Amino acid sequence: MKNLMNGACLALLMSGTAALANEQRAGRDRQAPQWAIQMGDYANTRYSTLDQINKDNVKDLRVAWTFSTGVLRGHEGSPLVIGDVMYVHTPFPNRVFALDLNDNGKILWRYEPQQDPNVIAVMSCDTVYRGLSYADGMILLGQADTTVVALDATSGEVKWSTKIGDPGIGETLTATVVPVKDKVLVGISGGEYGVRGRMTALNLTDGSEAWKAWSTGPDEELLVDPETTTHLGKPIGADSSLNSWEGDQWQIGGGTIWGWFSYDPDLNLVYYGTGNPSTWNPSQRPGDNKWSMTIMARDADTGMAKWFYQMTPHDEWDYDGVNEMILTNQTVDGQERKLLTHFDRNGLAYTMDRETGELLVAEKYDPVVNWTTGVDMDPNSETYGRPAVVAEYSTAQNGEDENTTGVCPAALGTKDQQPAAFSPKTNLFYVPTNHVCMDYEPFRVAYTAGQPYVGATLSMYPAPNSHGGMGNFIAWHNTTGEIKWSVPEQFSVWSGALATAGDVVFYGTLEGYLKPVDAQTGEELYKFKTPSGIIGNVMTYEHGGKQYVGILSGVGGWAGIGLAAGLTNPNDGLGAVGGYASLSQYTELGGQLTVFELPG
């Protein structure tokens, strides 16, 4: 397979940036090198054309300034920079700060929502929020209690607010909301409470509901056409979801949407993934449990589905499919294709044609993945696109109240929501990963609204017979399905990556280090330990002719839930407390933004 088409890739990246950086999106200066969207662009590449900081001088980085958020617990996502203002968010209670970059980060305004603290009890993997969005002079925030708020970017005044869920039954909001054209796309969290997943599109002008697409249930609620919506090129047929569940289990069947969304303006398609089916005990939900664990492509205006691909039918290990979809234009076997690349929790990296939903590549991006021997890639096979499950590691085949040991990866996946980056200069994807395995014992559980609906006991540990650590940072070829290089880390890499035109890739570690590495080789070029563990995403911007790099630190998330919530039982945090127990020897709770610069 041939290398990527650099020009085509850059054209896609710039089209996404232009769509955001006009008067209706990223406003004040069309050419300003801002950070106007959480993922850098609609294609989710997390790539910046800034190159003032490069592989030759990054060793000279120093701290330019810091800002305390005043909130502990896990800080995911990143700030936004629009013109001369930086917008910073926090985990619950979801504060928002507007900082003046022309005046030493002076607080221009702050927003402090009043939320019922009882919502904390139903946030299964810490009180995180993955970041703000910007559109039409408004800062868009999704609060933990499922309220979407539009704030005037200049004053902080509430323009409108809309509540899209019910925390009383376990529904929360942790994913960033994404403005696309005249809509705001909003997911929902709560799969561990039997929440039925859905995507809601609100009208940008007033927050009213435009459309809603469920992950499970009747065709009319899925927003599918049984004859034209396809799965691997074939029509899904009538009642595709209902036929894959026993009875009414689909009504509490999960498939929640709490990851990242991408958008192709040429195809007018939105891409995202759905989460695990509920419960975690597979014996209680026979069937493929459609459309959980699925990549979805939908029309941005209507929500109608063009195609689906279910990666892990009848999920037995909590391998949510919510991770980001990265969009690139590439040449494959001599033909230019519009591609989508997805690094799933299940340990497989998928490359697909994002226009048709054709599956092109499905390979393990950590060699220790053992629950499957691989995906059937024969389009003429009855099992085309399905992973072949290894019986030894099948929690369904081993049954209830049986402890299935040595499953790789653990439930938190080879990668969770921490986003990868893509560089059109190297044609590589840079992926923060978890190198963790687990023991998994399912048990029968009854559904009660607002109570945990898990049904499994887990323990986690570093992948055996390896380097002894719990993470790697890798460079990946998406058209060949190969790792170019891998950097071992003591703990999972729970930070989002950033690639730049300076031939540098940045990421953070759970101990709290910001690390830039050489994009070609993975060689570490510098490191600085911030006050707390990093689960935020690295971002960069230019202000006053100077490039800066920013990162939120504040340990937490699933991997750091023991520290964040003060838990000590090894089985708590769905097994993460025991697996990451030694993290407390390296960091503590915090909540700080650290901004770096070069001298001069």
Swiss-Prot record:
Needed cofactors: pyrroloquinoline quinone; Ca(2+)
Signal peptide as annotated in the record: 1-21
Single GO molecular function: oxidoreductase activity, acting on CH-OH group of donors
Broad EC category: oxidoreductase
Residues reported to bind Ca(2+): E192, N276
Co-factor: note: Binds 1 PQQ group per subunit. Binds 1 Ca(2+) ion per subunit.
Protein name, UniProt field: Putative dehydrogenase XoxF
Taxonomic lineage: Bacteria, Pseudomonadati, Pseudomonadota, Alphaproteobacteria, Rhodobacterales
